[in-house]
A protein has these predicted regions:
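Extended basic (Lys/Arg/His-rich) segments that typically form rRNA-contacting surfaces
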Residues: 1-210
Length: 210
């Protein structure tokens, strides 16, 4: 499976040859390098371990630094593992970029959504609010929990107020609009989860025909 790590730069818009405006998210994947190879004979599966993002040496813990030193690779901020079909295509120290994807290709994008803190039902789940005037005491409070007298308690999993955001979100089938291999920049159609400078994982779509 083809996959890379990137940093979210922000959103902009581009024009197609037909003059249509397309909203795109700009992602940069610079400095991603193969740190370790895992083979089916030794580890039971084929995968590569990649490092991404600059980091100061003083901020790298010794076990992690030793892992990079063993591969003779400069320490990176993030360390992730990707399953691959053909392990022979990769070598330790090899740099990977956005050129593994083509314009028009569909990809899946994963990131950590923006944290919203503690929020109520209306914002967190989109529940309808009550009247805002004329003696209403409902306003933005939650409605019936549907527990009735037979249960007598709040059922686990009931949509309620609570912590919102700051969780892994995956968006499927985003289209690759442009690829700039020189600057290691890729433009994807639509929005991508997470804040600016957030870590993003881009992989080939698993549901290409849907």
């Amino acid at each position: 499976m083809k996959a890379i790590l990137g940093k979210k730069v922000g959103m902009t818009q581009v024009f197609t040859e037909q003059g249509e405006v397309v909203p795109v998210t700009v992602l940069q994947s610079e400095g991603m390098v193969v740190v370790q190879k895992k083979t089916e004979e030794k580890d039971g599966y084929n995968a590569i371990q990649v490092g991404f993002g600059d980091v100061k040496i003083k901020n790298v813990v010794k076990p992690k630094k030793g892992h990079f030193d063993k591969s003779k690779v400069e320490p990176k901020r993030f360390l992730r593992e990707f399953r691959v079909d053909n392990i022979e295509e990769y070598e330790v120290g090899q740099k990977l970029g956005v050129d593994i994807f083509q314009v028009g290709e569909k990809v899946d994008v994963s990131g950590i959504s923006k944290g919203k803190g503690f929020q109520g039902n209306v914002k967190r789940h989109g529940h309808s609010r009550g009247g805002m005037s004329h003696g209403s005491k409902f306003h933005r409070r939650r409605g019936s929990l549907g527990a009735s007298a037979g249960v007598g308690k709040v059922v686990k999993g009931t949509k309620n107020h609570g912590h919102m955001g700051n969780e892994k979100v995956t968006v499927l089938n985003l289209e690759v609009v442009r690829v700039d291999a020189d600057k290691n920049v890729i433009l994807l159609k639509g929005a991508v989860p997470g804040p600016k400078k957030g870590l993003i994982k881009i992989r080939e779509a698993v549901r290409k025909n849907k």
